[in-house]
């Protein structure tokens, strides 16, 4: 049952993507209790993204719990013209994620769970690669942490007391 599944629903102006559903088992004295775990990514397509996991005895309930958690955990991502400001490397557990801005017309070149996060946040041109593990939860966490750790040139300039042109080297 483990694997990559995608569901595009636009609800309340949010893009909701179902990344993974797993059947989980709890072994007790009287036998086995089956349940389901869901991983969902929610974004507005304009620089906000969140992810959540939910567990329940039935699939729809697990998905709904995950979507509620994802909506509550939304974070801002600074984007420029549908891509990133600069290259990012992010690690979570064994997952190592590399993301690099791309020129217009490149598209989203990323695999599996990373693609869901990038499409939900509103990135249209990017080159991305995941190394180390293919665990969807770790890959989604690493991708979101990398995107949210990125700082815009305006923020860096104000922190340093400089202008954006001085930061980017255009002066």
UniProtKB/Swiss-Prot annotation:
InterPro entries: Ribosomal_Su5_D2-typ_SF, Ribosomal_uS5, Ribosomal_uS5_bac-type, Ribosomal_uS5_C, Ribosomal_uS5_N, Ribosomal_uS5_N_CS, Ribsml_uS5_D2-typ_fold_subgr. One of its GO terms (biological process) is translation. This is Small ribosomal subunit protein uS5. Pfam families: Ribosomal_S5, Ribosomal_S5_C. The N-terminal domain interacts with the head of the 30S subunit; the C-terminal domain interacts with the body and contacts protein S4. The interaction surface between S4 and S5 is involved in control of translational fidelity. It comes from the Bacteria. Part of the 30S ribosomal subunit. Contacts proteins S4 and S8. GO terms for cellular component: small ribosomal subunit. It comes from Vesicomyosocius okutanii subsp. Calyptogena okutanii (strain HA). The keyword Ribosomal protein applies. Keywords: Ribonucleoprotein, Ribosomal protein, RNA-binding, rRNA-binding. Belongs to the universal ribosomal protein uS5 family. The lineage of its organism: Bacteria, Pseudomonadati, Pseudomonadota, Gammaproteobacteria, Candidatus Pseudothioglobaceae. The keyword Iron does not apply. With S4 and S12 plays an important role in translational accuracy. Residues 14-77 form the S5 DRBM domain. Gene3D superfamilies: 3.30.160.20, 3.30.230.10. GO terms for molecular function: rRNA binding; structural constituent of ribosome.
């Amino acid at each position: 049952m483990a694997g990559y599944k995608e569901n595009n629903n636009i609800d309340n102006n949010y893009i909701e993507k179902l990344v993974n559903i797993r059947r989980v088992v709890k072994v007790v004295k009287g036998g086995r209790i089956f349940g389901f775990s869901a991983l969902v990514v929610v974004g507005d397509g304009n620089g906000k993204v969140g992810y959540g996991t939910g567990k329940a005895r039935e699939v729809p309930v697990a998905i709904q719990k995950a979507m509620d958690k994802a909506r509550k955990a939304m974070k801002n991502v600074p984007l420029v013209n549908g891509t990133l400001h600069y290259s990012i490397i992010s690690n979570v557990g064994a997952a190592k994620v590399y993301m690099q801005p791309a020129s217009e017309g490149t598209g989203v070149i990323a695999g599996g769970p990373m693609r869901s996060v990038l499409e939900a946040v509103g990135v249209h041109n990017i080159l991305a690669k995941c190394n180390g593990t293919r665990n969807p939860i770790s890959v989604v966490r690493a991708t979101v942490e990398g995107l949210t750790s990125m700082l815009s040139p305006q923020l860096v300039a104000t922190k340093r007391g400089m202008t954006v042109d001085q930061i980017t080297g255009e002066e």
